[in-house]
Amino acid sequence: MTSTLFVVSEHGYWGEECIEPLTTLEEHDLDVTVATPTGEPPVVDERSVDPDNVGEETANQVREVQENHPELNDPVRLAKATAVDYDAIVFPGGHGTEWDVNQDSHARRLLRNAVAGTEGKALVVCHAVGLLAFTRDDGGFLVEGRAVTGFPNEWEEGIVDEDDLMPDGRKLPYWVEDEVRAADADWDAELDADTSVTVDGDLITARGPGSSAQAARTLLDELDVEAPADD
């Protein structure tokens, strides 16, 4: 069975960016394991389950899976995960990743081994793309020269204030686009497109929540996974 590891933030993951790929992969009979930095259950960003923000259907779906999914409620510690055990590693986004996953040494190791090694593939979504700015391979940035998309500055401007404070009062540590560009990535968030998913070798990146479904389908294609046969 094809296996996947979801590395999810304890400081606020964006619901759709985790739940859409997770449920899609499971519907295609992939085995899913969830890891968090400390092994505590991940925390959903409340803005991503606000019906006024994301719509009632999405909000209800995310809450239902968040509350009842066995792996989300009993994750493994990130330090115990090894890339060789999985065919793909998924890094859902959310501003919370900037405080834990993106700067976690074990997350960087997993990403590096999946993308630069032979252990599998990686799907990195939205703010989690910032992880690429902190991941090095042979002394250089892993993302150097690679085509990527991610959460753009233009969108961030509509969320934080002039002091980079978020609606919940936290100060954003950095802007994803700025950091990933500084790591010499070939950045294009395709702002004129409805969705944005980019494939560069074993690295798949997705722009944001609206690209989550396409990102999941792209990962399935890259893994050569076909839809399960009807009973």
Model-derived features: where do they sit?
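Short, thiol/selenol-centered motifs that function as redox-active sites or metal-ligating centers
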Residues: 124-128
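Extended, subdomain-level signal for the structured scaffold at the beginning of enzyme domains
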Residues: 1-120, 130-231
